[in-house]
Amino acid sequence: MPELGILGNHVILDLDSSGNLTWPGAIPKRLCWGVGADDRWHFSEERASIRQSVDSNEITTLTRMRVPGGDITQRVEVIPWGGQSVTKLEFYNETPIPVAISIMLLNFGPVEINSRTVSIDAKPVIASSKTPRMLINGLGYQDITDRIVNAELEDIRTSKLSTNSPSDDSALIFPLPHSTKLELLINNEDLDNLPDIERSPSFNDVSNGWQKHFESGMEIQTDDNRLTSVLNTARRHLLIGSDQEIASRFWNVDSDEPVVPLAALALMAWGHTDSAKKLIFKYMESAPTNLFKNSVDKETLYALCLWQKYLEFCSQEEELEDIILWINETVRQLLASLPVKRKLKKRDMTLEIVSLRAAIEILTFMQQKTLATELQNQLVKIEEVIGSKENPSPFEKYTDSYEISIETLGGYLQIQENSLTLDQILSKANPTGSLIMGSRQQDPVFSALFLLIIRAGFLQEKKLPSGEKQIQVASSYDLDWIGVGIQVKNAPISSGIMGYAIRWHGTSPALLWEANTSTRIQINAEKLDESWFSNDHIGETLLSKQIPKETAVSIHANTSLLKNRIRPDSPDGGTFQ
């Protein structure tokens, strides 16, 4: 039940668990549907006979309604058109008998039909692959469905178009013979024209486009479809969200978690730095300003810390000259807002101190060494007064520990467990990979936190006192992983990328890795072998033998997150990039 949209566009649709669509707005428009079968009309709001899953392309949501004789399937996507977007909706009749499809348009306004085009005020609203046989107008969902039920089904299947008095709510009735499909293109943005259905992108085209976006970032390959579905849905959700304004409904979440910074962190951690940069700019520019006193709000301080985090993942050649004026002004306001020395100890200065350190690192990166040195000297004086130099990053609990990050998500989901597992998190998501929170069909806080815990569970990066970067792989390993092959590709690390694969020789895991970075690194796999580490950028090793639980096979064989285990003698351990 994801929120649907495309990159580079502000339109987002809600798709609920029954396949109904909502266009949010001051007066939300809604599209519901029904099937006229041999026995009666079946409407999407009834829900009892409806199931949802992800299509075979691993992206598109597939909704099935059971009627006598088989299923009527629905697929829906938002597709690009002329720099904007339209919604593509398809119904397919898998039964051996003809049916009728009702498309209920609520709050759309009075419609007119001209062959296969439905218009409002002379502008096309819907283009269809078939001509509707009947137009029924009414007042609200219940009145519309009552009128549909009272219409003669045989007339709907055979008669010419008939209608009654126009109103803001209406229903289009289409015939749908067996093994045929009905395609609709719906106007999202008050466009003057709609594309030809025959020339519009297919659902597989849309899926391939999203897969290419995913492949530009970090990839994790396992044999568990649930994990794949939730990962794809979460990444797609935040990529779409990066084009939404900060004040939009998308980011309006009832949560104490900093939703926009979390989303930017997740996008960076998965290699989608362009989308993350775009989102940080919007967040930075949306921060409130106070013209009458020197003060810096929390959002601005978070933005400083996000830019510091961004430097870890961006190219060393990348220029950030367009934020230097903002950095200088923010630092000036931040220093001016600090209390006098005698009051420094009485106030929690953690976020301010961390933000100053972030500003120093950013200025150093941008070759503003004089400013960076001046700021460093002032920071030393402040730290001497408050008597502490240990100030954790505001994002530490989301990025630095798999155990802490999964506890954070568990708390957000109100899961009361002492030792939370990934299986328990995945069980909260529905078959489409999304998770309903309140009135939202998909929750951006969950999307961001989930991506961050999976990143931490498969690859973590920390800075050692020696200056080396420590990279820990397979932090989420437990004994249910014995015999399970995994593969990680294109994981962003400091000034580079890394990939690794684990394959098994009996109960001993073999680790293969390759890190493409100029930074000194130390790689370890503490959950698999506490004593092993390597400073090599490329290598392979056989880690210590794992001792399975005595009851592991009988209890966990069918419920493990990663079900399809690799035989010890199998050569198919996978490769990585």
Walk through the language-model features, giving the residues of each.
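Amphipathic, well-ordered alpha-helical segments in soluble domains
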Residues: 33-34, 59, 279, 299-306, ...
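The feature captures the catalytic groove of carbohydrate-active enzymes
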Residues: 166-200, 294-298, 321-383, 505-507, ...
